[in-house]
Protein backbone atom coordinates (compact mmCIF):
# COMPACT_ATOMS: atom_id res chain seq x y z
CA UNK A 1 0.00 0.00 0.00
CA UNK A 2 1.02 3.61 -0.41
CA UNK A 3 2.01 4.81 3.06
CA UNK A 4 0.10 7.71 4.52
CA UNK A 5 2.72 9.94 6.10
CA UNK A 6 5.37 11.36 3.79
CA UNK A 7 8.35 12.53 5.84
CA UNK A 8 8.33 16.31 6.05
CA UNK A 9 4.84 16.67 4.58
CA UNK A 10 1.68 17.62 6.45
CA UNK A 11 -0.98 14.95 6.24
CA UNK A 12 -4.57 16.08 5.69
CA UNK A 13 -7.25 14.20 7.60
CA UNK A 14 -11.00 14.53 7.06
CA UNK A 15 -13.23 13.20 9.84
CA UNK A 16 -16.73 12.67 8.49
CA UNK A 17 -20.12 12.06 10.10
CA UNK A 18 -22.23 10.45 7.34
CA UNK A 19 -26.03 10.50 7.00
CA UNK A 20 -28.45 9.75 8.45
CA UNK A 21 -29.31 10.44 12.07
CA UNK A 22 -31.36 13.10 13.83
CA UNK A 23 -30.18 16.58 12.77
CA UNK A 24 -30.67 18.05 16.24
CA UNK A 25 -27.07 18.45 17.45
CA UNK A 26 -23.50 18.17 16.11
CA UNK A 27 -21.72 14.80 16.24
CA UNK A 28 -19.52 14.28 19.29
CA UNK A 29 -17.10 11.66 17.92
CA UNK A 30 -15.59 13.77 15.11
CA UNK A 31 -15.40 16.78 17.46
CA UNK A 32 -13.39 14.83 20.05
CA UNK A 33 -11.12 13.18 17.47
CA UNK A 34 -10.47 16.53 15.79
CA UNK A 35 -9.54 18.13 19.11
CA UNK A 36 -7.22 15.26 20.06
CA UNK A 37 -5.40 15.24 16.72
CA UNK A 38 -4.95 19.02 16.74
CA UNK A 39 -3.42 18.85 20.22
CA UNK A 40 -1.14 15.88 19.66
CA UNK A 41 0.01 16.13 16.05
CA UNK A 42 1.02 19.48 14.56
CA UNK A 43 1.95 17.58 11.38
CA UNK A 44 -1.67 16.63 10.74
CA UNK A 45 -4.16 19.10 9.29
CA UNK A 46 -7.61 18.04 10.55
CA UNK A 47 -11.06 19.07 9.44
CA UNK A 48 -14.40 17.64 10.55
CA UNK A 49 -17.40 17.40 8.23
CA UNK A 50 -20.99 16.85 9.30
CA UNK A 51 -22.37 15.39 6.09
CA UNK A 52 -25.48 14.36 8.00
CA UNK A 53 -26.45 18.00 8.58
CA UNK A 54 -25.47 18.85 5.01
CA UNK A 55 -27.70 15.97 3.85
CA UNK A 56 -30.69 17.53 5.62
CA UNK A 57 -29.83 21.06 4.46
CA UNK A 58 -29.63 19.92 0.83
CA UNK A 59 -32.76 17.77 1.15
CA UNK A 60 -34.82 20.67 2.47
CA UNK A 61 -33.56 23.01 -0.25
CA UNK A 62 -34.24 20.45 -2.98
CA UNK A 63 -37.69 19.78 -1.54
CA UNK A 64 -38.53 23.49 -1.59
CA UNK A 65 -37.35 23.77 -5.22
CA UNK A 66 -39.34 20.76 -6.35
CA UNK A 67 -36.25 18.68 -7.14
CA UNK A 68 -37.56 15.99 -4.79
CA UNK A 69 -41.28 15.34 -4.79
CA UNK A 70 -42.77 13.83 -1.64
CA UNK A 71 -46.36 13.45 -0.51
CA UNK A 72 -47.27 13.36 3.17
CA UNK A 73 -50.75 12.53 4.40
CA UNK A 74 -53.31 13.73 1.79
CA UNK A 75 -51.20 16.70 0.64
CA UNK A 76 -49.86 17.19 -2.85
CA UNK A 77 -46.11 17.66 -3.45
CA UNK A 78 -46.17 21.46 -3.27
CA UNK A 79 -48.20 21.52 -0.07
CA UNK A 80 -45.93 18.88 1.47
CA UNK A 81 -42.83 20.97 0.70
CA UNK A 82 -44.45 24.04 2.24
CA UNK A 83 -45.55 22.21 5.38
CA UNK A 84 -42.16 20.59 5.92
CA UNK A 85 -40.50 24.00 5.52
CA UNK A 86 -42.94 25.47 8.04
CA UNK A 87 -42.19 22.62 10.44
CA UNK A 88 -38.44 23.22 10.30
CA UNK A 89 -38.94 26.95 10.79
CA UNK A 90 -41.15 26.33 13.81
CA UNK A 91 -38.78 23.80 15.38
CA UNK A 92 -35.92 26.28 15.13
CA UNK A 93 -37.67 29.59 15.86
CA UNK A 94 -41.30 29.03 16.82
CA UNK A 95 -40.80 28.26 20.51
CA UNK A 96 -38.62 31.22 21.49
CA UNK A 97 -41.39 33.28 23.06
CA UNK A 98 -43.59 30.40 24.17
CA UNK A 99 -43.12 26.65 23.84
CA UNK A 100 -46.61 25.64 22.73
CA UNK A 101 -46.76 21.85 23.11
CA UNK A 102 -49.74 21.39 20.81
CA UNK A 103 -48.07 23.29 17.99
CA UNK A 104 -44.76 21.55 18.68
CA UNK A 105 -46.34 18.11 18.43
CA UNK A 106 -48.08 19.10 15.18
CA UNK A 107 -44.92 20.34 13.48
CA UNK A 108 -42.49 17.76 14.84
CA UNK A 109 -44.81 14.99 13.63
CA UNK A 110 -44.69 16.49 10.13
CA UNK A 111 -40.90 16.61 10.28
CA UNK A 112 -40.68 13.04 11.59
CA UNK A 113 -42.91 11.84 8.74
CA UNK A 114 -40.65 13.63 6.27
CA UNK A 115 -37.56 12.04 7.84
CA UNK A 116 -39.02 8.55 7.73
CA UNK A 117 -40.10 8.71 4.09
CA UNK A 118 -37.12 10.61 2.71
CA UNK A 119 -34.49 8.58 4.58
CA UNK A 120 -36.06 5.26 3.59
CA UNK A 121 -36.06 6.40 -0.05
CA UNK A 122 -32.47 7.64 0.06
CA UNK A 123 -31.28 4.48 1.81
CA UNK A 124 -32.78 2.46 -1.04
CA UNK A 125 -31.11 4.79 -3.54
CA UNK A 126 -27.77 4.44 -1.75
CA UNK A 127 -27.99 0.65 -2.03
CA UNK A 128 -28.91 0.87 -5.72
CA UNK A 129 -25.99 3.21 -6.39
CA UNK A 130 -23.58 0.88 -4.58
CA UNK A 131 -24.60 -2.22 -6.51
CA UNK A 132 -24.56 -0.46 -9.86
CA UNK A 133 -28.28 -0.04 -10.52
CA UNK A 134 -29.58 3.16 -12.05
CA UNK A 135 -30.79 5.97 -9.83
CA UNK A 136 -32.50 9.22 -10.85
CA UNK A 137 -30.02 11.83 -12.01
CA UNK A 138 -31.17 14.23 -9.28
CA UNK A 139 -30.32 11.60 -6.65
CA UNK A 140 -26.91 10.96 -8.19
CA UNK A 141 -26.15 14.69 -8.11
CA UNK A 142 -27.39 14.89 -4.52
CA UNK A 143 -25.00 12.17 -3.36
CA UNK A 144 -22.06 13.62 -5.29
CA UNK A 145 -22.72 17.08 -3.89
CA UNK A 146 -22.54 15.64 -0.38
CA UNK A 147 -18.95 14.49 -0.73
CA UNK A 148 -17.74 17.53 -2.70
CA UNK A 149 -16.70 19.50 0.43
CA UNK A 150 -14.53 16.57 1.51
CA UNK A 151 -12.98 16.21 -1.94
CA UNK A 152 -12.39 19.97 -2.17
CA UNK A 153 -10.45 19.77 1.08
CA UNK A 154 -8.20 17.17 -0.55
CA UNK A 155 -7.47 14.80 2.35
CA UNK A 156 -4.95 11.98 2.36
CA UNK A 157 -7.04 10.00 4.83
CA UNK A 158 -10.81 10.02 5.41
CA UNK A 159 -12.25 8.81 8.70
CA UNK A 160 -15.94 7.88 8.73
CA UNK A 161 -17.52 8.01 12.19
CA UNK A 162 -20.63 5.84 12.47
CA UNK A 163 -22.82 6.12 15.55
CA UNK A 164 -26.00 4.39 14.38
CA UNK A 165 -26.78 1.52 12.04
CA UNK A 166 -28.83 3.92 9.90
CA UNK A 167 -25.53 5.52 8.85
CA UNK A 168 -23.80 2.32 7.72
CA UNK A 169 -25.02 2.13 4.12
CA UNK A 170 -24.47 5.86 3.62
CA UNK A 171 -20.96 5.58 5.07
CA UNK A 172 -20.08 2.90 2.53
CA UNK A 173 -21.56 5.01 -0.27
CA UNK A 174 -19.57 8.06 0.86
CA UNK A 175 -16.41 5.92 0.83
CA UNK A 176 -17.22 4.62 -2.66
CA UNK A 177 -17.89 8.10 -4.07
CA UNK A 178 -14.72 9.49 -2.51
CA UNK A 179 -12.56 6.67 -3.87
CA UNK A 180 -14.10 7.09 -7.33
CA UNK A 181 -12.74 10.64 -7.47
CA UNK A 182 -9.41 10.25 -5.69
CA UNK A 183 -7.17 7.40 -4.56
CA UNK A 184 -7.13 7.93 -0.81
CA UNK A 185 -7.29 5.78 2.28
CA UNK A 186 -10.54 5.37 4.22
CA UNK A 187 -10.91 4.27 7.84
CA UNK A 188 -14.25 3.40 9.42
CA UNK A 189 -14.86 3.77 13.15
CA UNK A 190 -17.36 4.97 15.70
CA UNK A 191 -19.60 3.59 18.41
CA UNK A 192 -21.55 1.39 15.98
CA UNK A 193 -18.42 -0.69 15.42
CA UNK A 194 -17.63 -0.64 19.11
CA UNK A 195 -20.75 -2.61 20.02
CA UNK A 196 -20.18 -5.24 17.33
CA UNK A 197 -19.10 -8.60 18.69
CA UNK A 198 -16.98 -9.42 15.63
CA UNK A 199 -16.21 -6.23 13.66
CA UNK A 200 -13.50 -8.04 11.70
CA UNK A 201 -16.30 -9.86 9.86
CA UNK A 202 -16.86 -6.67 7.89
CA UNK A 203 -13.70 -7.59 5.98
CA UNK A 204 -14.17 -11.35 6.05
CA UNK A 205 -17.74 -11.64 4.81
CA UNK A 206 -19.42 -10.11 1.75
CA UNK A 207 -21.79 -7.21 2.24
CA UNK A 208 -25.17 -8.20 0.85
CA UNK A 209 -27.43 -5.44 -0.40
CA UNK A 210 -31.00 -6.13 -1.45
CA UNK A 211 -33.22 -3.74 -3.36
CA UNK A 212 -36.60 -4.27 -4.95
CA UNK A 213 -34.83 -5.34 -8.13
CA UNK A 214 -31.91 -7.51 -7.09
CA UNK A 215 -29.51 -8.74 -4.42
CA UNK A 216 -25.78 -8.32 -4.83
CA UNK A 217 -22.64 -8.91 -2.79
CA UNK A 218 -19.90 -6.32 -2.36
CA UNK A 219 -16.43 -6.63 -0.92
CA UNK A 220 -16.03 -4.19 1.95
CA UNK A 221 -12.28 -3.88 1.38
CA UNK A 222 -12.69 -2.20 -1.99
CA UNK A 223 -14.17 0.84 -0.24
CA UNK A 224 -12.66 0.81 3.26
CA UNK A 225 -8.99 0.20 4.10
CA UNK A 226 -9.06 0.16 7.90
CA UNK A 227 -11.42 -0.34 10.83
CA UNK A 228 -11.06 1.14 14.31
CA UNK A 229 -13.73 -0.63 16.38
CA UNK A 230 -12.44 0.62 19.73
CA UNK A 231 -11.38 4.01 21.03
CA UNK A 232 -10.21 6.08 18.13
CA UNK A 233 -7.95 8.83 19.45
CA UNK A 234 -4.63 7.00 19.81
CA UNK A 235 -5.39 4.69 16.90
CA UNK A 236 -6.14 7.51 14.48
CA UNK A 237 -3.08 9.47 15.61
CA UNK A 238 -0.79 6.46 15.05
CA UNK A 239 -2.44 5.70 11.72
CA UNK A 240 -1.74 9.25 10.55
CA UNK A 241 1.90 8.81 11.60
CA UNK A 242 2.35 5.49 9.76
CA UNK A 243 5.19 5.81 7.23
CA UNK A 244 5.07 2.30 5.85
CA UNK A 245 3.04 -0.87 5.97
CA UNK A 246 5.11 -2.23 8.84
CA UNK A 247 3.99 0.69 11.02
CA UNK A 248 0.38 -0.47 10.78
CA UNK A 249 1.15 -3.27 13.23
CA UNK A 250 1.79 -0.62 15.90
CA UNK A 251 -1.59 1.10 15.51
CA UNK A 252 -3.79 0.06 18.47
CA UNK A 253 -7.36 -1.15 17.82
CA UNK A 254 -6.71 -1.31 14.07
CA UNK A 255 -8.28 -3.98 11.85
CA UNK A 256 -6.99 -4.23 8.28
CA UNK A 257 -6.18 -6.59 5.44
CA UNK A 258 -2.65 -7.79 4.72
CA UNK A 259 -1.69 -10.59 2.37
CA UNK A 260 -5.40 -11.39 1.93
CA UNK A 261 -5.76 -11.99 5.65
CA UNK A 262 -7.49 -9.88 8.30
CA UNK A 263 -5.09 -8.48 10.89
CA UNK A 264 -6.39 -7.36 14.28
CA UNK A 265 -4.16 -5.25 16.50
CA UNK A 266 -4.52 -5.40 20.30
CA UNK A 267 -7.04 -3.06 21.94
CA UNK A 268 -5.96 0.08 23.75
CA UNK A 269 -7.73 2.46 26.10
CA UNK A 270 -6.70 5.88 27.38
CA UNK A 271 -6.84 5.45 31.14
CA UNK A 272 -6.44 9.14 31.94
CA UNK A 273 -9.29 10.99 30.22
CA UNK A 274 -7.54 14.23 31.07
CA UNK A 275 -5.24 13.47 28.11
CA UNK A 276 -8.19 14.06 25.79
CA UNK A 277 -9.07 17.74 25.30
CA UNK A 278 -12.66 18.92 25.14
CA UNK A 279 -14.58 18.51 21.87
CA UNK A 280 -13.91 20.96 19.05
CA UNK A 281 -17.11 21.98 17.26
CA UNK A 282 -15.51 24.82 15.28
CA UNK A 283 -15.97 23.06 11.93
CA UNK A 284 -19.74 22.81 12.38
CA UNK A 285 -22.33 25.50 11.66
CA UNK A 286 -24.21 25.25 14.93
CA UNK A 287 -27.08 27.46 13.80
CA UNK A 288 -28.06 24.85 11.19
CA UNK A 289 -29.17 22.18 13.65
CA UNK A 290 -32.91 21.72 13.90
CA UNK A 291 -34.18 22.54 17.36
CA UNK A 292 -35.26 25.38 19.65
CA UNK A 293 -31.76 25.63 21.17
CA UNK A 294 -28.25 24.59 20.17
CA UNK A 295 -27.50 21.59 22.37
CA UNK A 296 -23.90 20.36 22.49
CA UNK A 297 -23.09 16.74 23.34
CA UNK A 298 -20.58 16.21 26.15
CA UNK A 299 -18.90 13.14 27.62
CA UNK A 300 -17.57 13.18 31.19
CA UNK A 301 -16.79 9.46 31.42
CA UNK A 302 -16.28 6.41 29.24
CA UNK A 303 -17.71 2.98 29.69
CA UNK A 304 -20.51 1.88 31.98
CA UNK A 305 -20.01 1.87 35.77
CA UNK A 306 -22.47 -1.03 36.02
CA UNK A 307 -21.77 -3.11 32.91
CA UNK A 308 -23.86 -6.14 33.90
CA UNK A 309 -27.13 -5.80 31.97
CA UNK A 310 -27.73 -9.08 30.19
CA UNK A 311 -29.23 -7.52 27.05
CA UNK A 312 -26.49 -4.94 26.49
CA UNK A 313 -23.38 -4.91 24.30
CA UNK A 314 -22.12 -1.43 25.20
CA UNK A 315 -19.40 -2.96 27.36
CA UNK A 316 -17.56 -3.64 24.07
CA UNK A 317 -17.33 0.08 23.26
CA UNK A 318 -14.91 1.37 25.89
CA UNK A 319 -13.86 -1.87 27.68
CA UNK A 320 -13.66 -0.29 31.14
CA UNK A 321 -15.17 2.59 33.06
CA UNK A 322 -13.15 5.80 33.50
CA UNK A 323 -14.07 9.29 34.64
CA UNK A 324 -12.85 12.73 33.69
CA UNK A 325 -11.92 14.68 36.82
CA UNK A 326 -14.57 17.10 38.08
CA UNK A 327 -12.28 20.13 37.68
CA UNK A 328 -11.46 19.09 34.12
CA UNK A 329 -15.19 18.67 33.41
CA UNK A 330 -15.83 22.20 34.64
CA UNK A 331 -12.98 23.58 32.55
CA UNK A 332 -14.31 21.93 29.39
CA UNK A 333 -17.90 23.01 30.11
CA UNK A 334 -16.77 26.59 30.68
CA UNK A 335 -14.91 26.53 27.37
CA UNK A 336 -17.92 25.23 25.46
CA UNK A 337 -20.17 27.85 27.02
CA UNK A 338 -17.80 30.76 26.43
CA UNK A 339 -16.37 29.76 23.04
CA UNK A 340 -19.63 28.76 21.36
CA UNK A 341 -22.10 30.84 23.34
CA UNK A 342 -24.09 27.72 24.16
CA UNK A 343 -25.78 27.01 27.50
CA UNK A 344 -27.39 23.64 26.72
CA UNK A 345 -25.50 20.36 27.14
CA UNK A 346 -26.48 16.73 26.70
CA UNK A 347 -24.26 14.41 28.76
CA UNK A 348 -23.59 11.32 26.65
CA UNK A 349 -22.21 9.27 29.56
CA UNK A 350 -23.72 5.77 29.67
CA UNK A 351 -24.96 6.88 33.08
CA UNK A 352 -23.71 9.13 35.87
CA UNK A 353 -23.49 7.30 39.24
CA UNK A 354 -25.14 9.02 42.25
CA UNK A 355 -21.94 10.01 44.10
CA UNK A 356 -20.37 11.48 40.98
CA UNK A 357 -23.61 13.22 40.03
CA UNK A 358 -23.72 14.88 43.45
CA UNK A 359 -20.10 16.04 43.19
CA UNK A 360 -20.56 17.31 39.64
CA UNK A 361 -23.78 19.18 40.44
CA UNK A 362 -22.28 20.79 43.54
CA UNK A 363 -19.17 21.83 41.61
CA UNK A 364 -21.26 23.45 38.86
CA UNK A 365 -23.15 25.42 41.52
CA UNK A 366 -19.97 26.41 43.36
CA UNK A 367 -18.39 27.70 40.15
CA UNK A 368 -21.51 29.63 39.17
CA UNK A 369 -21.70 27.99 35.73
CA UNK A 370 -25.17 28.63 34.32
CA UNK A 371 -26.18 25.80 32.01
CA UNK A 372 -29.19 23.59 31.33
CA UNK A 373 -28.39 19.94 30.82
CA UNK A 374 -29.73 16.43 30.36
CA UNK A 375 -28.05 13.23 31.56
CA UNK A 376 -28.55 9.48 31.84
CA UNK A 377 -28.83 7.86 35.27
CA UNK A 378 -29.96 4.70 37.00
CA UNK A 379 -33.09 5.03 39.19
CA UNK A 380 -31.68 3.87 42.51
CA UNK A 381 -32.48 5.07 46.04
CA UNK A 382 -29.26 7.10 46.33
CA UNK A 383 -31.01 9.66 44.13
CA UNK A 384 -32.92 11.04 47.10
CA UNK A 385 -34.89 14.27 47.33
CA UNK A 386 -31.95 16.40 48.44
CA UNK A 387 -29.72 15.19 45.62
CA UNK A 388 -32.40 15.65 42.98
CA UNK A 389 -33.00 19.22 44.16
CA UNK A 390 -29.23 19.78 44.01
CA UNK A 391 -29.17 18.50 40.42
CA UNK A 392 -32.00 20.88 39.53
CA UNK A 393 -30.18 23.84 41.11
CA UNK A 394 -27.07 23.01 39.08
CA UNK A 395 -29.01 23.26 35.81
CA UNK A 396 -30.18 19.68 35.47
CA UNK A 397 -33.46 19.75 33.59
CA UNK A 398 -33.94 16.27 32.11
CA UNK A 399 -32.84 12.95 33.57
CA UNK A 400 -33.09 9.89 31.33
CA UNK A 401 -33.69 6.82 33.46
CA UNK A 402 -33.28 3.16 32.46
CA UNK A 403 -36.44 1.73 34.04
CA UNK A 404 -36.98 -1.00 31.38
CA UNK A 405 -39.72 -2.98 33.18
CA UNK A 406 -42.03 -2.79 36.18
CA UNK A 407 -41.65 -6.50 36.89
CA UNK A 408 -39.05 -7.12 39.57
CA UNK A 409 -38.52 -10.67 38.31
CA UNK A 410 -37.75 -9.36 34.82
CA UNK A 411 -35.45 -6.65 36.21
CA UNK A 412 -33.55 -9.30 38.17
CA UNK A 413 -33.17 -11.41 35.03
CA UNK A 414 -31.89 -8.33 33.21
CA UNK A 415 -29.40 -7.77 36.05
CA UNK A 416 -30.38 -4.12 36.14
CA UNK A 417 -29.51 -3.74 39.81
CA UNK A 418 -32.68 -1.74 40.44
CA UNK A 419 -35.80 -2.14 42.58
CA UNK A 420 -39.04 -1.05 40.96
CA UNK A 421 -40.40 0.51 44.15
CA UNK A 422 -37.22 2.57 44.49
CA UNK A 423 -37.38 3.56 40.82
CA UNK A 424 -40.97 4.70 41.27
CA UNK A 425 -40.01 6.89 44.23
CA UNK A 426 -37.04 8.35 42.33
CA UNK A 427 -39.33 9.38 39.46
CA UNK A 428 -41.79 10.99 41.84
CA UNK A 429 -39.08 12.78 43.82
CA UNK A 430 -37.41 13.97 40.61
CA UNK A 431 -40.71 15.41 39.39
CA UNK A 432 -41.23 17.23 42.69
CA UNK A 433 -37.65 18.55 42.46
CA UNK A 434 -38.50 20.28 39.16
CA UNK A 435 -36.78 17.74 36.90
CA UNK A 436 -38.34 16.13 33.84
CA UNK A 437 -38.09 12.38 33.54
CA UNK A 438 -37.55 10.53 30.29
CA UNK A 439 -37.75 6.80 30.93
CA UNK A 440 -36.70 3.85 28.80
CA UNK A 441 -39.01 0.84 28.67
CA UNK A 442 -38.28 -2.47 26.95
CA UNK A 443 -41.15 -4.85 26.22
CA UNK A 444 -40.77 -8.54 25.46
CA UNK A 445 -37.65 -9.46 27.41
CA UNK A 446 -37.36 -13.27 27.19
CA UNK A 447 -39.65 -15.07 29.69
CA UNK A 448 -41.77 -11.92 30.23
CA UNK A 449 -45.40 -12.98 30.61
CA UNK A 450 -48.52 -11.13 29.55
CA UNK A 451 -49.19 -10.36 33.22
CA UNK A 452 -45.72 -8.79 33.53
CA UNK A 453 -46.24 -6.88 30.28
CA UNK A 454 -49.44 -5.47 31.79
CA UNK A 455 -47.62 -4.77 35.05
CA UNK A 456 -45.40 -2.35 33.14
CA UNK A 457 -48.42 -0.76 31.45
CA UNK A 458 -50.04 -0.25 34.85
CA UNK A 459 -46.83 1.29 36.18
CA UNK A 460 -46.89 3.79 33.32
CA UNK A 461 -50.54 4.64 34.00
CA UNK A 462 -49.98 5.04 37.72
CA UNK A 463 -46.92 7.28 37.31
CA UNK A 464 -47.86 9.21 34.19
CA UNK A 465 -47.74 12.52 36.11
CA UNK A 466 -44.02 11.90 36.70
CA UNK A 467 -43.16 10.50 33.27
CA UNK A 468 -42.62 13.46 30.98
CA UNK A 469 -41.29 11.48 28.02
CA UNK A 470 -41.20 7.80 27.13
CA UNK A 471 -38.68 6.00 24.94
CA UNK A 472 -40.24 2.62 24.30
CA UNK A 473 -39.18 -0.37 22.30
CA UNK A 474 -39.35 -4.10 21.80
CA UNK A 475 -36.58 -6.43 22.94
CA UNK A 476 -33.91 -7.06 20.31
CA UNK A 477 -31.48 -9.96 20.69
CA UNK A 478 -28.04 -8.39 20.21
CA UNK A 479 -24.99 -10.35 19.13
CA UNK A 480 -22.45 -10.44 21.95
CA UNK A 481 -24.95 -9.88 24.75
CA UNK A 482 -25.05 -12.37 27.61
CA UNK A 483 -28.49 -13.48 26.42
CA UNK A 484 -27.10 -14.39 23.02
CA UNK A 485 -24.10 -16.17 24.55
CA UNK A 486 -26.11 -18.04 27.24
CA UNK A 487 -29.62 -18.44 25.79
CA UNK A 488 -30.40 -21.38 28.08
CA UNK A 489 -30.43 -19.00 31.06
CA UNK A 490 -33.31 -17.08 29.46
CA UNK A 491 -35.53 -19.94 28.24
CA UNK A 492 -34.41 -19.38 24.65
CA UNK A 493 -34.55 -22.68 22.82
CA UNK A 494 -33.49 -21.58 19.34
CA UNK A 495 -31.56 -18.69 17.80
CA UNK A 496 -31.15 -18.24 14.06
CA UNK A 497 -30.15 -15.38 11.82
CA UNK A 498 -33.13 -13.64 10.29
CA UNK A 499 -33.49 -13.54 6.52
CA UNK A 500 -32.87 -9.78 6.53
CA UNK A 501 -29.71 -10.11 8.68
CA UNK A 502 -26.55 -8.64 7.17
CA UNK A 503 -22.89 -8.62 8.19
CA UNK A 504 -23.21 -4.94 9.09
CA UNK A 505 -26.52 -5.45 10.93
CA UNK A 506 -26.97 -8.85 12.54
CA UNK A 507 -30.63 -9.63 13.22
CA UNK A 508 -31.73 -12.75 15.08
CA UNK A 509 -34.99 -14.64 15.36
CA UNK A 510 -35.47 -16.72 18.47
CA UNK A 511 -37.92 -19.03 20.18
CA UNK A 512 -38.67 -19.28 23.90
CA UNK A 513 -39.97 -22.15 26.02
CA UNK A 514 -41.88 -19.88 28.38
CA UNK A 515 -43.28 -16.38 28.42
CA UNK A 516 -44.29 -14.31 25.42
CA UNK A 517 -42.74 -15.19 22.10
CA UNK A 518 -41.64 -12.40 19.74
CA UNK A 519 -44.85 -12.53 17.68
CA UNK A 520 -47.15 -12.59 20.71
CA UNK A 521 -45.27 -9.68 22.22
CA UNK A 522 -45.49 -7.67 19.00
CA UNK A 523 -49.26 -8.15 18.89
CA UNK A 524 -49.58 -6.92 22.48
CA UNK A 525 -47.24 -4.02 21.82
CA UNK A 526 -49.18 -2.82 18.78
CA UNK A 527 -52.45 -3.27 20.63
CA UNK A 528 -51.24 -0.85 23.31
CA UNK A 529 -49.34 1.62 21.13
CA UNK A 530 -52.02 4.31 21.41
CA UNK A 531 -51.85 4.18 25.19
CA UNK A 532 -48.05 4.21 25.15
CA UNK A 533 -48.00 7.28 22.92
CA UNK A 534 -50.28 9.09 25.37
CA UNK A 535 -47.60 8.94 28.08
CA UNK A 536 -45.60 12.14 28.48
CA UNK A 537 -45.89 15.60 26.98
CA UNK A 538 -45.28 14.39 23.41
CA UNK A 539 -44.46 10.93 22.05
CA UNK A 540 -41.87 12.66 19.85
CA UNK A 541 -39.68 13.71 22.77
CA UNK A 542 -38.33 10.16 23.00
CA UNK A 543 -36.75 10.62 19.57
CA UNK A 544 -35.96 14.34 19.76
CA UNK A 545 -34.38 14.54 23.20
CA UNK A 546 -32.64 17.85 22.58
CA UNK A 547 -36.11 19.34 22.07
CA UNK A 548 -37.22 17.92 25.42
CA UNK A 549 -34.30 19.65 27.12
CA UNK A 550 -35.27 22.97 25.53
CA UNK A 551 -38.87 22.47 26.63
CA UNK A 552 -37.85 21.57 30.18
CA UNK A 553 -35.63 24.65 30.41
CA UNK A 554 -38.51 26.84 29.21
CA UNK A 555 -40.66 25.61 32.09
CA UNK A 556 -38.20 26.09 34.92
CA UNK A 557 -39.98 26.26 38.24
CA UNK A 558 -38.68 25.99 41.81
CA UNK A 559 -38.75 22.52 43.36
CA UNK A 560 -41.80 21.62 45.42
CA UNK A 561 -41.38 21.44 49.19
Model-predicted segments: where are they?
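Conserved SAM/AdoMet-binding glycine-rich loop
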Residues: 13-20, 157, 187-188, 195, ...
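Canonical Radical SAM [4Fe-4S] cluster-binding loop centered on the CxxxCxxC motif
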Residues: 291-327
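N-terminal [4Fe-4S]-dependent radical SAM core
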Residues: 4-11, 257-297
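Conserved, mostly hydrophobic/aromatic
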Residues: 37, 254, 304, 347, ...
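Glycine-rich beta-alpha loop elements in corrinoid/cobalamin-binding modules
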Residues: 9-12, 20-58, 115-266
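Conserved Radical SAM active-site core
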Residues: 11, 54-62, 66-155, 180, ...
